[in-house]
């Protein structure tokens, strides 16, 4: 019986066993201990084959190769004559992975990290990898201030060489900062410096940013804030010498000590721009001008670099290198800035692509582009395309990427990635007020009809006082130059008396069409014509109404009037300025418009109306979660010549679109009715509107509580103050009106004010809008409508 010789017994092969210079020829290879791993797979990983002449070095390579597969805990190679016997112990297979006690770290994140490390169900268990994962997770907890945290991997053996892996977390509590000390500050107090930190040793109740829980990343950010604070104030030699973080014995408290050297303040001496600026030296120098005696400012240096990059980017130099080297003169305390520029290659756009537009046609997006294919890359043109796509209102998000073309020194591809939102809506609206009760509204509208960018809509309202229906159509690119064409037809049966307005009924129908002409990127003009037929009846003898009838040659008497009709043709003119950052939930920019309507010869009436609307959004923080919104609306109309503007063209205020908290259309003059054959006048609470209006609103858009970042683009909350007034410039106080106690409706000073909160949500079920407002300043006869909501269905 041949004697087996032990060749290798560990991972590191030694040369203790020597077979001679020529080794031996392998006639056969046998494996012992294989369970999960197939013999063929094991043989493929071995550098030795049957028939090979092997030496001690070859055996060592064999063992290392088998260990490298990660399938074995132990490998031994023995020789029985000319047969190699490979004895292995397989690593156990992971049958399941579970977690316990993890609150700060979600299971999905843990599974992703384990997957990235090769730890997954069905794979072999590598105890070294598990130990590294334990340490890595504990380091993570330490970095967020949980110094008492521990992570232990519990391995439970199962039959057939399998194991259950369970990670047990003991997270503990976050260590809180007991004190932050800054040593070496002479020009500024410690409190003044710490007030700019996120980490605090004391956090007032009103500070929603400050945090006493220690986090390593936040400390690093605060140190950078401290450095920027000094560099922006001329301290060019400022340095953070050291930072000590000490832990209390119970691991629940943290003391932070920051040692700094302020150094003296330095002034800017001059700025020298040099290098390859591709012929744009003078433009770069204009961007780097300084004032005499100006302090050194680190942020300004960064802005100079960014401005030069943006300037070159407009001319196709997409990847310039801009480096600033400050030359500090400690004798006269000045700094000379040397800005070296290398414009690099000019890049041209090969392709512009769109991703995510499953509904919208490519042509709808492409016509908004200002960057052209084949032209040099202009960063401002690329950004303009992004802004215009956002402004369409079809997309929740728009991102743009510029990628260099592999193998080409001067070509890039531009890719716009969009996430479409539901632009079609089937809306069912409900309004409820303390006086108005319940009203209903239905509407079908598609702002991006079949992905063409056209708007098609059918809207209707039905309540106690109105039956309204309209069909609208608008093509924003009626011509390739961006001339738009829109139109609508409508029918309206309005019973003013049921709406607590001045008593009359108006059955009207009409149509209008409008052409829009783009002037530049942000301005456009509109020209349109319209026709409307009004059939008035059930008119009660109301002072302002009778004043209008008399101005058009009617003698209504004092018992009411039936069967008065008008046909009017109008010329409609408008202007719009829009630089909002997006069409849906804007966060910055201004949108303003002026609209004018004037009757033309052939009309029964002669009047004009002018309205001005504006909305301005100002972000208050970097991520634009806090935004200040200001809105305003002005309106004025009057008759031409001796005629008055029709009373049914009056302006109204109150309701969700003007002054929330007040009933719709209820703000302003109230009806004064003739009585006793015109001998007297009586007061009422029926609103009649006026020929002049002013509305203003200030709104603070805030982060929505308890909403994850995933839904932040579809939910908006705000706190607002609305104000407005409506008046009649043709109103005349007479002895009759004064005797009836009727106020002077010609005054613009009777301003109503309300305050409240609002929530808007583009939900999967449709657009939902909630508002609750309470009148702060009102007048006798005003009616409130404090709560309103709107529910819709989108597709």
Swiss-Prot record:
HAMAP family: OM_assembly_BamA (MF_01430). Its main location: membrane. Keywords: Cell outer membrane, Membrane, Repeat, Signal, Transmembrane, Transmembrane beta strand. Residues 1-20 form the signal peptide. Belongs to the BamA family. InterPro entries: Bac_surfAg_D15 (IPR000184), BamA/TamA_POTRA (IPR010827), D15-like (IPR039910), OM_assembly_BamA (IPR023707), POTRA (IPR034746). This is Outer membrane protein assembly factor BamA. One of its GO terms (cellular component) is Bam protein complex. The keyword Transmembrane applies. It is found in: Cell outer membrane. Part of the Bam complex, which is composed of the outer membrane protein BamA, and four lipoproteins BamB, BamC, BamD and BamE. GO terms for biological process: Gram-negative-bacterium-type cell outer membrane assembly; protein insertion into membrane. The keyword Membrane applies. Transmembrane segments: none annotated. It holds the Pfam family POTRA. Residues 24-91, 92-172, 175-263, 266-344, 347-421 form the POTRA domain. Part of the outer membrane protein assembly complex, which is involved in assembly and insertion of beta-barrel proteins into the outer membrane. Constitutes, with BamD, the core component of the assembly machinery. It comes from the Bacteria. It comes from Yersinia pestis.
């Amino acid at each position: 019986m041949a004697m087996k010789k032990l060749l290798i017994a560990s991972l590191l092969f030694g040369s203790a066993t020597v077979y001679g210079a020529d080794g031996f020829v392998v006639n056969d290879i046998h494996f012992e201990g294989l369970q999960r791993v197939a013999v063929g797979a094991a043989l493929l990983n071995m550098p030795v084959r049957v028939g090979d002449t092997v030496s001690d070095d070859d055996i060592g390579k064999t063992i290392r190769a088998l260990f490298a597969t990660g399938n074995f805990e132990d490998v031994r190679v023995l020789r029985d004559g000319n047969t190699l016997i490979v004895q292995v112990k397989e690593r156990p297979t992971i049958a399941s992975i579970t977690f316990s006690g993890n609150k700060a770290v979600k299971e999905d994140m843990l599974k992703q990290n384990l997957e990235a490390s090769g730890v997954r169900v069905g794979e072999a268990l590598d105890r070294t990898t598990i130990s590294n994962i334990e340490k890595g997770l504990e380091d993570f907890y330490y970095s967020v201030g949980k110094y008492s945290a521990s992570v232990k991997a519990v391995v439970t053996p199962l039959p057939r060489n399998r194991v259950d892996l369970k990670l047990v977390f003991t997270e503990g509590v976050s260590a809180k900062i007991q004190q932050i000390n800054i040593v070496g500050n002479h020009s500024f107090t410690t409190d003044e410096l710490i007030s700019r930190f996120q980490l605090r040793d004391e956090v007032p109740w009103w500070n929603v940013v400050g945090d006493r829980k220690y986090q390593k990343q936040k400390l690093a950010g605060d140190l950078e804030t401290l450095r920027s604070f000094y560099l922006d104030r001329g301290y060019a030699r400022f340095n953070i010498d050291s930072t000590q973080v000490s832990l209390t014995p119970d691991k629940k408290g943290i003391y932070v000590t920051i040692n700094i050297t302020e150094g003296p303040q330095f002034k800017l001496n001059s700025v020298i721009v040099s290098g390859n600026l591709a012929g744009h030296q003078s433009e770069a120098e204009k961007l780097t001008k300084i004032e005499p005696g100006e302090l050194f400012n680190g942020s300004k240096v960064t802005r100079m670099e960014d401005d030069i990059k943006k300037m070159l980017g407009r001319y196709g130099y997409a990847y310039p290198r801009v480096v600033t080297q400050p030359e500090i003169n400690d004798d006269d305390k000045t700094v000379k800035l040397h800005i070296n520029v290398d414009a690099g290659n000019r890049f041209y756009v090969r392709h512009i692509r769109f991703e995510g537009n499953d509904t919208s046609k490519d042509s709808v997006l492409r016509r908004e582009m200002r960057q052209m294919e084949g032209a040099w890359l202009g960063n401002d043109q690329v950004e303009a395309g992004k802004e215009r796509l956002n402004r369409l209102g079809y997309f929740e998000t728009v991102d743009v990427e510029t990628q260099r073309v592999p193998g080409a020194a001067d070509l890039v591809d531009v890719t716009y990635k969009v996430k479409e939102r539901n632009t079609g809506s089937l809306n069912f609206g409900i309004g409820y007020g303390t006086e108005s009760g319940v009203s209903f509204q239905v509407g079908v509208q598609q702002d991006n009809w079949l992905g063409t960018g056209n708007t098609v809509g059918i809207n209707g309202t039905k309540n106690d006082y109105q039956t309204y229906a309209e069909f609208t159509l608008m093509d924003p690119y009626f011509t390739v130059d961006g001339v738009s064409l829109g139109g609508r037809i409508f029918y309206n049966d309005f019973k003013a008396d049921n709406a607590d307005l001045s008593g009359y009924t108006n059955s009207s129908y009409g149509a209008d069409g409008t052409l829009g002409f783009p002037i530049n990127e942000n301005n456009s003009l509109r020209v349109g014509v319209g026709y409307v037929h009004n059939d008035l009846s059930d008119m009660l003898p109301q002072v302002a109404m009778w004043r209008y009838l008399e101005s058009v040659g009617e003698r209504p008497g004092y018992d009411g009037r039936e069967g008065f009709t008008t046909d009017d043709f109008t010329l409609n003119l408008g202007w719009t300025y829009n630089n909002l950052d997006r069409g849906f939930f804007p966060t910055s920019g201004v949108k303003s418009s002026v609209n004018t309507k004037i009757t033309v010869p052939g009309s029964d009436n002669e009047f004009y109306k002018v309205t001005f609307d504006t909305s301005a959004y100002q972000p208050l923080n970097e991520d634009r979660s806090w935004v200040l919104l200001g809105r305003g609306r002005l309106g004025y109309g009057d008759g031409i010549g001796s005629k008055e503007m029709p009373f049914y063209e009056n302006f109204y205020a109150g309701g969700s679109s003007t002054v929330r908290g007040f009933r719709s259309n209820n703000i302003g003059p109230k009806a004064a009715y003739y009585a006793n054959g015109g001998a007297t006048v009586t007061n009422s609470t029926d609103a009649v509107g006026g020929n002049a209006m002013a509305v203003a609103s200030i709104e603070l858009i805030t982060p929505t509580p308890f909403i994850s970042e995933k839904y932040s683009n579809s939910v908006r909350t705000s706190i607002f103050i609305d104000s407005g007034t409506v008046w009649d410039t043709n109103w005349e106080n007479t002895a009759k009106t004064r005797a009836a106690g009727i106020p002077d409706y010609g005054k613009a000073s009777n301003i109503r004010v309300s305050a409240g909160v609002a929530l808007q949500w583009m939900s999967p079920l449709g657009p939902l809008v909630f508002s609750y407002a309470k009148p702060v300043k009102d007048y006798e006869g005003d009616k409130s409508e404090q709560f309103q909501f709107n529910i819709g269905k989108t597709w």
